[in-house]
């Protein structure tokens, strides 16, 4: 009821304004009685993933809480795990506004935010202040003005900063909104990056005396040869897991709708089939050896089960959560 009213109001406003308005209020009121408006008790459905003990297999995808300002509020909603970021070494403003558009006819969003965030030091301070004891993923990226040849330096910088504060780390090489970033998903560039990051991870494990799994987030816009190459590279470099998928550049599913031709990544219902296909292919190509978090177009029980049946160990929601609210978490967890 509360979310229906809130959504009705926010959907009359600019999409990014509504996003910031929601985050500001979640952050402001998380430790007050007003948090009862979104808090809910969700039955425990424990799952072990990469040695991490989760209360349930439904997580918040990266991109919603880029600066880790609302961890407490999202925990109150019942997420089994929360992923914050994408964060970069230095603060950056992102792309020009407007840069976020709703396609309500398809329960979808197009965004070209461009990794807008306040930088990794700010995120780490927010994580410390939250005192969150649940499972926290931290999603890392490179600054827009960092050349791809030096991209691994940005990822390593972020890894070092977040390592002791993260339950797992996600390497984002699949956002379509940082020029050239997706080129890191292919061939020698991918192997070079993953080898460097794996070596850094092993050094950090030795330094801090704790295991922090490293996952890679990939795009849905991969052809069969590319999916096979990515799978081989993830396995050969002993990457701990994969998140499939990010947003799509494909527009055929929303052709003719308002904002359909806006540049950026499309998320929500239209990416569901593509994301599920990538999950299924990853499962097949790796012989089930690679733990998978499925994300993309999950906005009800059947779409969550579809990802799990395709091979995902866990699921994440973002756009579906924007359209359906905290009740979506509860309905999915109850059904699993």
Curated annotation (Swiss-Prot):
Role summary: Catalyzes the conversion of dihydroorotate to orotate with quinone as electron acceptor.
Localization, UniProt: Cell membrane
GO cellular component: cytoplasm; plasma membrane
Membrane topology: Peripheral membrane protein
InterPro entries per the UniProt record, alphabetical: Aldolase_TIM, DHO_dehydrogenase, Dihydroorotate_DH_1_2, Dihydroorotate_DH_2, Dihydroorotate_DH_cat, Dihydroorotate_DH_CS
Protein name: Dihydroorotate dehydrogenase (quinone)
Enzyme's top EC category: oxidoreductase
Keywords: Cell membrane, Flavoprotein, FMN, Membrane, Oxidoreductase, Pyrimidine biosynthesis
Source organism per UniProt: Pseudoalteromonas translucida (strain TAC 125)
Cofactor(s) this protein cannot do without: FMN
Keyword Zinc: no
Pfam families (alphabetical): DHO_dh (PF01180)
NCBIfam families reported in the protein's UniProt record: PRK05286.1-1, PRK05286.1-2, PRK05286.1-4, PRK05286.2-5, pyrD_sub2
One GO MF term attached to the UniProt entry: dihydroorotate dehydrogenase (quinone) activity
GO biological process, one term: 'de novo' UMP biosynthetic process
Free-text cofactor note: Binds 1 FMN per subunit.
Residues noted as binding FMN in the record, renumbered to the chain: 62-66, 86, 139, 172, 217, 245, 268, 297, 318-319
Binding site for substrate: 66, 111-115, 172, 177, 246-247
E.C. designation(s): 1.3.5.2
PROSITE patterns cross-referenced by the UniProt entry: DHODEHASE_1, DHODEHASE_2
Family: Belongs to the dihydroorotate dehydrogenase family. Type 2 subfamily.
């Amino acid at each position: 009821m509360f979310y229906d009213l809130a959504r009705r109001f926010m959907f009359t406003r600019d999409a990014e304004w509504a996003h910031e308005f929601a985050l500001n209020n979640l952050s402001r009121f998380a430790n007050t009685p007003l948090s009862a408006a979104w808090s809910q008790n969700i039955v425990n459905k424990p799952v072990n993933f990469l040695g991490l003990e989760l209360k349930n297999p439904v997580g918040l995808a990266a991109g919603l809480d880029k600066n880790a300002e609302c961890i407490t509020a999202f925990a109150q909603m019942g997420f089994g795990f929360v992923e914050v970021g994408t964060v970069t070494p230095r603060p950056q403003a992102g792309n020009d506004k407007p840069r976020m558009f709703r396609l309500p006819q398809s329960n979808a969003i197009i965004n070209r935010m461009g990794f807008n965030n306040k930088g990794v030091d700010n995120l780490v301070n927010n994580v410390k202040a939250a005192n969150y004891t649940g499972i926290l993923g931290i999603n890392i990226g490179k600054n827009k003005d960092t050349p791809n040849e030096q991209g691994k330096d940005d990822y390593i910088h972020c890894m070092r900063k977040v390592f002791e504060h993260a339950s797992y780390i996600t390497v984002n090489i699949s956002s379509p909104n940082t020029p050239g970033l997706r080129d890191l998903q292919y061939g020698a560039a991918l192997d070079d990056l993953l080898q460097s990051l794996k070596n850094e991870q092993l050094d950090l494990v030795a330094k801090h005396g704790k295991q922090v799994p490293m996952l890679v987030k990939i795009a849905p816009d991969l052809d069969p040869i590319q999916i096979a190459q990515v799978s081989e590279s993830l396995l050969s470099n002993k990457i701990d897991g994969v998140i499939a998928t990010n947003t799509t550049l494909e527009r055929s599913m929303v052709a003719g709708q308002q904002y359909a031709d806006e540049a950026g990544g499309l998320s929500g219902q239209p990416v569901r089939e593509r994301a599920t296909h990538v999950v299924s292919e990853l499962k097949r190509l790796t012989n089930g050896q690679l733990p998978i978090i499925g994300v993309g177009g999950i906005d009800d029980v059947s779409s969550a089960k579809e990802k799990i049946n395709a091979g995902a160990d866990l699921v994440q929601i973002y756009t579906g959560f924007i359209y359906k609210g905290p009740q979506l978490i509860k309905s999915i967890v109850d059904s699993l």
